[in-house]
Amino acid sequence: MKMTKKMMGLVLAGVLAASMTGCGKKADPAATATAVETTEETKAAEETKAAGETEAAGKTYKIGVLQLVQHTALDKTNEGFVAALKDAGVSCEFDQQNAAGDQSACQTIANTLVNNGNDLIFAIATPAAQAVAGVTDSIPILVSAVTDPAASDLVDSNEAPNCNVSGTSDLTPVKEQIDLMQKILPDVKTVGLLYCSAEANSVLQAEMAKEALDTAGIAYKDYTVSSSNEIQTVVESMVGNVDCIYTPTDNMIAAGMTTVAMVANENKIPTIVGEEGMVDAGGLATYGIDYYQLGYMAGEQAVAILTEGADIKTMPIGYLDASKCTLKVNEETAKELGIDISGLK
C-alpha cells in the first residue's frame, strides 16, 4: 500500500513521541498529582453543570398568568406567550386567571398567584402588572400590553429594570395612526379622543395623539369614560361634534368596541383605532402592532429566565420593530360609511 506524506508524518510523530517517553526524564510526582486534581475538578464541574441542565430540562415550571380582561389583543398576547414556551420545549403548568376588567379582582388574584408558589408570573395589561408587582419583589414578573412600564412605576427604567419586573411594551405608532387618518379622511376638522381616564397607558397615548394632531393642525376634544357602562352614552355625545373618532390601545374601549362601532357607524363617524382586534369589532382602520408577536417575545424572555439563568433585573423592556406593524382596514365598515379605501392597497 502506498503511504501518503500525511500518513508518514503521523507515523513519525508517533515514533518520536514514543522515543521521548522512553528516554526522557521521569515525570514530576507533584506535577502529576496537580494535573490529576485539576482533571478531577474539571470533571466534577462538568458533571455538576450537566446535572443542573438535566434538572432544568426535566423540571415542570409553574407559571401564573393574570389577564386584565378578555378582548382580542390581550387574548393574542396570552396565546403568543404560551406558544413561545411550548416551542422552546419548556414543560409548564399554567394557572390562567382573568380579572374580567375588575381592578380589585386583580389584587385578589395577584395575591393568590404569589401564595401558590409560581416560578414566574405573566401579567397582561398595566393594572394587572401593577397588582402583581405590588405583592412580590422576589418572583420574576413579566408584563405585556403595557405601554410604558417605567411611567407606570413598574421598573426603574425601560432600559434597565433593576427589579423583578421586565417584559414587552405595546407602544403603538400613534403618529402613523394619525397620518393614516389624514390619508383616509383628508377633510377631517375635529377628532374625538375616546379613552378610559383611569388607564395610564391610554392617557399617555392620548397625549401623543394630541401632539400629532397639533402638528397636523387638526382640532380635538377629549371624551373619556370611567366604566364600560358609560361607553354608549359618551359615543352618542360625539354625534354632530366630531368628524372622526380616535381611540388608542385602551382595554376598556377594546372590550366595548362593538358598542363604539354600532353608534359610530350608524351616525357615519369613522373610527381610527389602536389595534387590529378593534378593527375586527367594527372600527374602520388601524396601523398597529401584532399582539401575538408581543406575547411571543415575552415568552422568549421567560425561557431565558427559567432555563438559561438570565437576570431579569438587567433585562430591558422589549419593543416590536416598527416594520412589524401592519395596516388593517375593515372593508365592510368602509362600505357602510361610504369611504373609498382603494388608495390604501
Where are these regions (language model features)?
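Bacterial lipoprotein signal-peptidase II cleavage site
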Residues: 21-33
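Hydrophobic alpha-helical segments within soluble ligand-binding/sensing domains
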Residues: 56-58, 149-190, 290-310
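Extracytoplasmic "Venus flytrap"
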Residues: 58-82, 88, 95-105, 198-202, ...
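An alpha-beta-alpha
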Residues: 63, 81, 167-213, 311, ...
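Structural motif
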Residues: 93-115, 224-238
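Beta-alpha junction/loop-to-helix N-cap segments that form part of ligand/metal-binding clefts
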Residues: 98-156, 250-274
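Pocket-lining segment of extracytoplasmic ligand-binding domains
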Residues: 200-269, 275
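Flexible loop/turn connectors
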Residues: 278-329
